[in-house]
């Protein structure tokens, strides 16, 4: 015969588990990212690595928290943030006027150089040469925004990531891929038939995106100031990005 214990006996236990769960959430900073953009964020042996990933981890450490990540398509990052699925987003996200209407941003933590990756037999030397070329870039990036500002909208083919863009270049479907200098260097080193040159410097830096009016924005800016003052931010930039000018 089963004995039915009073429900009130279990209430403290349930309450305890509930408190632990809330405490755990309070100690975690959940970032959205897209692990398809080395050396900023990428997957290696099933683990996210890169410049942005280490910045997020150091920010969390300064704030006494643990950084965790949700890896997704770049185009899904800001919608995930808008719907409250994550606390913040770090994934080479350019601070633009349009984005600032919807989201808060941290202070910029990096200003990228824009580079043209091309086949060595058909080099690109400057921005003017792009007007005669078919151009690939990653959807929603600084490069797409910048190319449109140069009145090159009709020349652009967008891809989900730069790996797809490079494959299109190697196959001859496009003439040039415009991307960040750090990634241009990596792709050129991995593909002997390719090279790159720096064609411009972005005026809009990368920032960490947050929900509008989030109190976390001030905390993250404080952490970035700490990392800038103690030299850790510069160390990370040297470690992951090095010298990409060419």
Ranges and model annotations:
Residues 20, 53-62, 121-124, 128-134, ...:
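Extended ligand-binding regions for polar small-molecule ligands
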Residues 33-35, 110-118, 181, 185-225, ...:
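Periplasmic-binding protein-like
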Residues 53, 69-79, 139-142, 157-167:
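Short helix-initiation/N-cap motifs at beta->coil->alpha
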Residues 65, 93-94, 107-155:
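A conserved helix-loop-strand patch within extracytoplasmic ligand-binding domains
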């Amino acid at each position: 015969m089963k004995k039915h214990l009073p429900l009130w006996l279990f209430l403290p236990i349930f309450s305890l588990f509930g408190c632990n769960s809330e405490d755990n959430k309070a100690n975690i900073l959940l970032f959205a990212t897209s692990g398809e953009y080395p050396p900023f964020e990428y997957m290696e042996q099933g683990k996210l690595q890169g410049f942005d990933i280490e910045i997020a981890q150091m920010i969390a450490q300064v704030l006494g928290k643990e950084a965790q990540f949700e890896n997704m398509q770049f185009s899904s990052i800001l919608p995930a943030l808008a719907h409250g699925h994550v606390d913040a987003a770090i994934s080479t996200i350019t601070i633009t006027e349009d984005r600032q209407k919807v989201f808060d941003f941290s202070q910029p933590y990096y200003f990228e150089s824009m580079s043209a990756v091309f086949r060595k037999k058909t080099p690109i030397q400057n921005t003017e040469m792009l007007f005669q070329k078919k151009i690939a870039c990653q959807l929603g990036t600084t490069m797409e925004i910048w190319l449109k500002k140069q009145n090159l909208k009709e020349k652009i083919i967008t891809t989900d990531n730069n790996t797809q863009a490079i494959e299109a270049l190697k196959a001859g479907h496009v003439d040039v891929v415009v991307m960040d200098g750090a990634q241009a260097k990596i792709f050129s080193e991995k593909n002997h038939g390719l090279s790159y040159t720096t064609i411009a410097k972005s005026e809009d830096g990368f920032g960490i995106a947050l929900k509008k009016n989030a109190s976390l924005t001030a905390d993250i800016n404080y952490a970035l100031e700490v990392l800038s003052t103690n030299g850790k931010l510069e160390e990370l930039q040297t470690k992951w990005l090095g010298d990409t000018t060419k």
